[in-house]
Amino acid sequence: MKVKKHRFPGVYIVIDDDGSEKIATKNLVPGQRVYGERVVKFEGEEYRIWNPTRSKLGAAILNGLKNFPIKPGSTVLYLGVASGTTASHVSDIVGWEGKVFGVEFSPRVLRELVPLVEERRNIVPILGDATKPEGYRALVPKVDVIFEDVAQPTQAKILIDNAKVYLKSGGYGMISVKSRSIDVTKEPEQVFKEVEKELSTYFEVVERLSLEPYEKDHALFVVRKP
């Protein structure tokens, strides 16, 4: 087994003895597993395998994502942080110089994040409603990237509203869109076109990528604030 750097800073490729490749992040808190993921050691460093079936962002990278604005030192607002599966990999990437502000609506789900953030001090858990971005203004500064994984019909509007308050000029948004959460009666492609049109009223749409086969009827959009 060996590990090499991915073209995205902070992401790695683990090459198993059988030649198969997986993506991973260097564990910011060695010894800590977050969601039962496989952990490997190579040349004195510990890497956490990024499971694409458990993480939309992981699926996007494996599917050939071209634009990945989350980098070492980035400040990220994560909407729909849940119990921290993807956020833990984002935490690994941004490192101690970066910060992940994780907004979650459900108190029960956010409680699951508490043990994680006790050691990962670069994740700030926030109980809040992503549809009301003013509600966490006292806690969140201007950020480099907003990542949204909120399965709601208004998810494009949620990203726009949060970007108006928190995203730096020239900053990036990433949004995982589940077509069935927006309109179950329409074909996914039609929904994605409508979302892209709505996003383009405020952002420059940089990229759109299907998350099949890892996530059915999902697409990831990367957008840039002018």
UniProtKB/Swiss-Prot annotation:
A GO term, aspect molecular function: RNA binding
User: Which Pfam families does the record match to this protein?
Assistant: Fibrillarin (PF01269)
In terms of SUPFAM superfamilies, this protein maps to: S-adenosyl-L-methionine-dependent methyltransferases
Q: Which UniProt keywords apply?
A: Methyltransferase, RNA-binding, rRNA processing, Transferase, tRNA processing
- This entry's Enzyme Commission designation comes to 2.1.1.-
Query: For binding S-adenosyl-L-methionine, which residues are annotated in this chain's numbering?
Result: 85-86, 104-105, 129-130, 149-152
Please give the InterPro entries that the UniProt record associates with this protein.
Answer: Fibrillarin, Fibrillarin_CS, SAM-dependent_MTases_sf
Q: GO biological process: any one? A: tRNA processing
Stated role: Involved in pre-rRNA and tRNA processing. Utilizes the methyl donor S-adenosyl-L-methionine to catalyze the site-specific 2'-hydroxyl methylation of ribose moieties in rRNA and tRNA. Site specificity is provided by a guide RNA that base pairs with the substrate. Methylation occurs at a characteristic distance from the sequence involved in base pairing with the guide RNA.
HAMAP family reported in the protein's UniProt record: RNA_methyltransf_FlpA
What family does the entry list?
Answer: Belongs to the methyltransferase superfamily. Fibrillarin family.
Quaternary structure and partners = Interacts with nop5. Component of box C/D small ribonucleoprotein (sRNP) particles that contain rpl7ae, FlpA and nop5, plus a guide RNA.
What is the name of the protein in this document?
Answer: Fibrillarin-like rRNA/tRNA 2'-O-methyltransferase
Taxonomic lineage from the root: Archaea, Methanobacteriati, Methanobacteriota, Thermococci, Thermococcales
Gene name in the database record: flpA
